Amino acid sequence: MSAQTSPAEKGLNPGLMCQESYACSGTDEAIFECDECCSLQCLRCEEELHRQERLRNHERIRLKPGHVPYCDLCKGLSGHLPGVRQRAIVRCQTCKINLCLECQKRTHSGGNKRRHPVTVYNVSNLQESLEAEEMDEETKRKKMTEKVVSFLLVDENEEIQVTNEEDFIRKLDCKPDQHLKVASIFGNTGDGKSHTLNHTFFYGREVFKTSPTQESCTVGVWAAYDPVHKVAVIDTEGLLGATVNLSQRTRLLLKVLAISDLVIYRTHADRLHNDLFKFLGDASEAYLKHYTKELKATTARCGLDVPLSTLGPAVIIFHETVHTQLLGSDHPSEVPEKLIQDRFRKLGRFPEAFSSIHYKGTRTYNPPTDFSGLRRALEQLLENNTTRSPRHPGVIFKALKALSDRFSGEIPDDQMAHSSFFPDEYFTCSSLCLSCGVGCKNSMNHGKEGVPHEAKSRCRYSHQYDNRVYTCKACYEGGEEVSVVPKTSASTDSPWMGLAKYAWSGYVIECPNCGVVYRSRQYWFGNQDPVDTVVRTEIVHVWPGTDGFLKDNNNAAQRLLDGMNFMAQSVSELSLGPTKAVTSWLTDQIAPAYWRPNSQILSCNKCATSFKDNDTKHHCRACGEGFCDSCSSKTRPVPERGWGPAPVRVCDNCYEARNVQLAVTEAQVDDEGGTLIARKVGEAVQNTLGAVVTAIDIPLGLVKDAARPAYWVPDHEILHCHNCRKEFSIKLSKHHCRACGQGFCDECSHDRRAVPSRGWDHPVRVCFNCNKKPAWTSLSVMTGKGPLC
């Protein structure tokens, strides 16, 4: 801490002498002040004293011109806060303490202490010094805000415009470990919200855009970082503006309010309107009802080390008038905050979510507006960490991201309530039961967390949706509710044995706890209805996107077809290699001489697509090269190659050059005549067999359609894969997911698992999405007792 005193430092405080006299006689000029030694010290005394081990860590400061120390007796009352501790006016030479005027009167006004010698400090020099320091501090603050710029945080469609935490911190231009608070502003459009923020936080610089035109210059939510107060300042779009998507933009305001520590409501009206109180009251109610729970969930889900207080932000109502008096001016005995609470109570609004509500008014006789009172009130609230403590910018971004993910999406106009600024429709799920029309009571996007739809009332039965669910009666009487479905066979039966039992004794109802509780044809006669004996019926809601409940899960016919297809496919796959080899060899033997052999054709001659083992290679009758089906789908006569006047397959290039005749000699035609005859005979046989196969495929398709389970999408309605959107063709086969019934390609549905809720107790084909879900989701969706399917 010690250093050599420069000649310039000598004479700065000629009236302040060393108060220690430890290494000097007390005649040396004081250079340092030690707050813990409670004395002014010269250079030598400061060095000698603080060489001692117990005094080494004392906090010392170098004196400035006109320095006056703090009162030592005030130190214990208010700590080290400047502006609270009083400056000393004298120093008692006997007690060796500095005293302010009040402490001197209290401790040295009577007794022997009245005679203690004192040294008087020059307070007039102190005042000039403090004013100079204040001016220097103001200049420093203005310089700190010179490079501050605002950025669009959320647009008018509730889309966050920063990609991640790092991008948010980079645009704020603050350190990642910087602790900061959030201050936002609300109010009607045109009341000067952006102008207020510019003058309150940024000394009049236009950080947030302002405009004298009628159009609103603030669209969406903009943010900037105030390095002086260490606060993220957020500017919002005005209320009562001529905008589209009004409901979504109003909901966006509450998201900003939820992440704020301090809220300014700016009003330029001569009298406080009811809209102000309704907005704050409705915002408080919606905050407690919808956002408190989500903020708690965000804390747990994101592992945030700083708790997001369930108590909302502090509110300052900044009221600027021109022609009328400020609130409370005609009632000096009542504070404005008391009058504010009375207005809330009269309107039936109770702003319980806010930690405090303050009123700060200013009357502007002549512009510009005085923002000094608002600035002082803001600084006091920002220093108060009792309710909301500063946090890292990453925590702020996570909270905003969580609220945006949860409360997003369009708000239907027919569901919107106009009696409140923040109706429940802004935050609750918009799904309606298809049977009874009751809405879901959960928050928006609850399906992302696996939470099913729920309603406040019970549903009614609809024959159209058959919204019944069977539960095991024995388990229900034992205190457990277990859903069951009719199906072809029991889970303990093998596929073929299950089909045999189904043919003999009908469908079964199986409970996971009780086993098989019912068979439809267990006896020759006298079989009772399961509802009367082993199951109970429950009527459940029908939510959009969910399948039926007691739809026919008897899949015996489809299981039989699957078994036959499996055997046929196994034989086909085993014989595919030898069959293709023999076919290629036989084709080469009867091919014309100018055709390229199949063994040399590895890819399409035009599009260069590589041929797989089961792909068909086509020869152009004009040039003889190998092509895929799409590059050789055109036909035209090729008489120059001996194919006569009938149209035959040619590639796209030869079709476009059909007017150019190939120069072939008569000798070539004669040489190719024999092979052409053999090839024509081979094609005639192939076409005949193809027609027979097509004739067989038509009734086979009818059989498959008849065997299709009720929840499967019909084949003729499936045009492309439900997952990758590839269009189905001759080469791309359709496959049904046994869980959801949608159509998929083989790549998107190659997983295998049991689907007991659909009657498939053994591993069967399912799509990627259904394979990720728990095994019991299909039924839990119906009853509302599990995650969303």
Curated annotation (Swiss-Prot):
Q: Which CDD domains match?
A: Bbox1_ZFYVE1_rpt1, Bbox1_ZFYVE1_rpt2, FYVE_ZFYV1, GBP
Q: What is this protein called?
A: Zinc finger FYVE domain-containing protein 1
Q: Where does Zn(2+) 4 bind?
A: 737, 740, 767, 770
What GO cellular-component annotations does this UniProt entry give? endoplasmic reticulum; endoplasmic reticulum membrane; Golgi apparatus; Golgi stack; lipid droplet; mitochondrion; omegasome; phagophore assembly site
The record ties this protein, via Pfam families, to:
ANCHR-like_BBOX (PF22586), FYVE (PF01363)
Q: Which GO terms describe its biological process?
A: lipid droplet formation
Q: Where does the chain cross the membrane? A: none
> Binding residues for Zn(2+) 3, per the UniProt record?
721, 724, 745, 748
The encoding gene: ZFYVE1
What are the entry keywords? Endoplasmic reticulum, Golgi apparatus, Lipid droplet, Metal-binding, Mitochondrion, Repeat, Zinc, Zinc-finger
**Where do the zinc-finger regions (FYVE-type) map?**
598-659, 715-775
Q: Region (Required for localization in the lipid droplets): which ranges? A: 416-788
Q: In the record, what terms sit under GO molecular function?
A: 1-phosphatidylinositol binding; phosphatidylinositol-3,4,5-trisphosphate binding; phosphatidylinositol-3,4-bisphosphate binding; phosphatidylinositol-3-phosphate binding; zinc ion binding
Q: Where in the cell is it found?
A: Golgi apparatus; Golgi apparatus, Golgi stack; Endoplasmic reticulum; Preautophagosomal structure
- Residues at which Zn(2+) 1 binds: 604, 607, 628, 631
Tell me the Gene3D superfamilies matching this sequence: P-loop containing nucleotide triphosphate hydrolases, Zinc/RING finger domain, C3HC4 (zinc finger)
Q: Quick one: which residues bind Zn(2+) 2?
A: 620, 623, 651, 654
